[in-house]
Amino acid sequence: ILSFVFLTISLAFTNNNVGKGNVQLALLQYRGGGDWYANKETSIPNLIEFCNRELKMNLNPEQAIVEAGSPEIFNYPFIHMTGHGNVQFSEQEAENLRTYLKSGGFLHIDDNYGMNPYVRPALKKIFPDKDLVELPFNHDIYKQRFPFASGLPKIHEHDGKNPQGFGIIIDGRVVCFYSYE
């Protein structure tokens, strides 16, 4: 559900298609065996339903699936990525994602537990000069329509660690949000 916060932010950069049902959200298909399809039947469909019902957004009700290296990636203002394991991007895929994010796209990565040691090196391949930075609870990303004054809610109860939100920021804009734990 936290994804709608990021969706709202990313859609602020799109044109007037939001109210016409033309904006479609996508699930990122990646290589490496990290089950990119985890929660495929629920994550984005539930987000779309919530945004259309609660935020009156009129998003396209069908999620898309887009490969990291595809030029189709530029058709989607919001891309969701999840999984439990290995993530690999070729040089071409990393370049495509870098261009997408620098051009106004937004990537939300949800650690479905076990993704952390793989997604961090994959992000370094996309942005070798950028680090994931923990976003403090007073960051604007937690102060949207439904504020999270105490930061991320705990979703997975695997190891008792507190949830954390990390971002990659370019020119003051969060282009990637990584919800960990």
Segments and roles (model prediction):
Residues 16-21, 71-75, 101-102, 161, ...:
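Extracellular/periplasmic catalytic domains that process cell-envelope and extracellular macromolecules
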Residues 25, 78-117:
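Short alpha-beta junction capping motif
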Residues 42-46, 50, 92, 96, ...:
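Extracytoplasmic/secreted proteins, especially bacterial periplasmic and envelope-associated proteins
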